[in-house]
A protein has these predicted regions:
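A polyanion-binding, active-site-adjacent surface
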Residues: 2-209
Length: 209
C-alpha cells in the first residue's frame, strides 16, 4: 500500500509542476505576441501521457478558447488518432509558440508564421513541458515544430515518419500539420493526405507498444 501511495503522491507533484508552468506562462511577455493574442494557450493533457504532439501555434479558435487543437485541425487530429489506434487520453498536445500570431483580413484573423525570435522566446516553455511530461514519443506536426525540435534543416515533405535520435524522447519524428490536410485542393487529395497522416501516427503507435 505504501508504494501505491508514493506513486500517487509523485503523480500529484508532477501535476502541480505542469499547472505551475501553465500559470507562469499565462503572464509571459518574452516576445510581443502577447500584445495581440487573447491569451496564452498552454499545452493540455495528462502528466502521464506517453505521446506528445507539438504543433506550430494556436489558431483563431484556440486563441479564444485558451486550449490547443480545439478548432477544425484539432477535430481532424482527433479522428486521425482514433483511426491510428492511439488513445487520446495518452496524448499531451501543445505548440512551439503559445500565442496566436495573426494579421487582419476583413473581419477575419489570418494565421501568420512565427519568426525565429518568437520561436526562441517560447522554446523554454516547450522544454519545460517535455521535462514535466517525459513522453516516450514526440511527434512534430508541421515544419515549424520539426525545425525547432529536430533540426533547422529538417524537411517534413521528405523526412516525414522517420525516427531521429534525440535526447528529448525515445522516439522523435515528424509529420504534416493537420491544417495542411484541410487545405488540400480536392476531396481526393484530402483523403490521400489523411491516409498518409494516419499511417504516420500508426507507425508511432506500433513503436511504443
Amino acid at each position: 500500500m505504501g508504494g501505491i501511495v508514493r506513486c500517487i503522491l509523485a503523480d500529484l507533484v508532477s501535476r502541480q509542476t505542469i499547472n505551475q508552468l501553465r500559470l507562469e506562462a499565462a503572464d509571459c511577455k518574452r516576445c510581443d505576441l502577447w500584445k495581440t493574442g487573447t491569451q496564452t494557450v498552454f499545452g493540455e493533457g495528462k502528466q502521464t501521457s506517453t505521446v506528445m504532439l507539438v504543433g506550430e501555434q494556436p489558431g483563431d479558435k484556440e486563441d479564444l478558447a485558451g486550449r490547443p487543437f480545439v478548432g477544425p485541425a484539432g477535430a481532424l487530429l482527433d479522428k486521425a488518432l482514433d483511426e491510428a489506434g492511439i488513445d487520446r487520453a495518452r496524448v499531451y498536445v501543445t505548440n512551439v509558440v503559445k500565442h496566436f500570431k495573426w494579421e487582419p483580413r476583413g473581419k477575419r484573423r489570418i494565421h501568420k508564421k512565427p519568426n525565429a525570435i518568437e520561436i526562441a522566446a517560447c522554446m523554454p516553455w516547450l522544454q519545460s513541458e517535455i521535462d514535466a511530461v517525459k513522453p516516450r514519443a514526440i511527434i512534430c506536426l508541421g515544419s515549424t515544430a520539426a525545425q525547432a525540435i529536430i533540426s533547422p534543416k529538417f524537411k517534413v515533405t521528405i523526412q516525414r515518419g522517420q525516427f531521429v535520435k534525440s535526447p528529448l524522447a525515445q522516439f522523435v519524428t515528424a509529420t504534416v500539420h493537420p491544417s495542411s490536410i484541410l487545405r488540400a485542393p480536392t476531396d481526393e487529395a484530402r483523403h490521400m493526405e489523411m491516409r498518409r497522416f494516419i499511417d504516420d501516427l500508426t507507425k508511432i503507435r506500433k513503436a511504443i507498444e
